[in-house]
Amino acid sequence: EIDLKVFTEAMEAMFEGKEVKMTEAQAQEVMMKFLQEQQEKATAKRAEDAKVNLEKGEAFLKENATKEGVKTSASGLQYKITKEGEGKKPTKDDMVTVEYEGRLIDGTVFDSSKANGGPVSFPVSQVIPGWTEGIQLLKEGGEATFYIPAKLAYREVGAGDKIGPNATLVFDVKLVKVGAPDAAAQQPVQVDVQKVQ
């Protein structure tokens, strides 16, 4: 265990040119141990967060599956069509333009096309699997809510500081257009819906 007080005093003495109670090599060794301990703590916390998020997500999806209008695909994607579209239906090879809002299961909004300046365009096959599958269920003008389990989203990796490991995601989506984007559409799509490699 590192005595932070002794370490801090030694570092201050070194910077002030005073006599140091430890050599530079000893200070580096202590610093390396400290950094390693911090990394181990962060890794353990991330593993615990992943476990908790997965459990909460599974419970959310189990309850959500019983709600009126919610359907579950073979992959585990849950969706609710809130407005039937009348236009073209996309394939995985198409480019689409959408409006969306992404939330965590606690309701925290982590991304939205409105906040990013308007509709966003992207290739259907270049986003997370839950989006690739879900967007193909809609026709132009259609709207839906996608309830995406972690295995169809960012899995144990998470995305940035907003989407934790094994997070279940909820997206309200409107399919604006299938095909080449309009000039007003933002490109490329934000990281929160990009495909995880």
PLM region descriptions:
Residues 1-197:
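Cross-family detector of peptidyl-prolyl cis-trans isomerase
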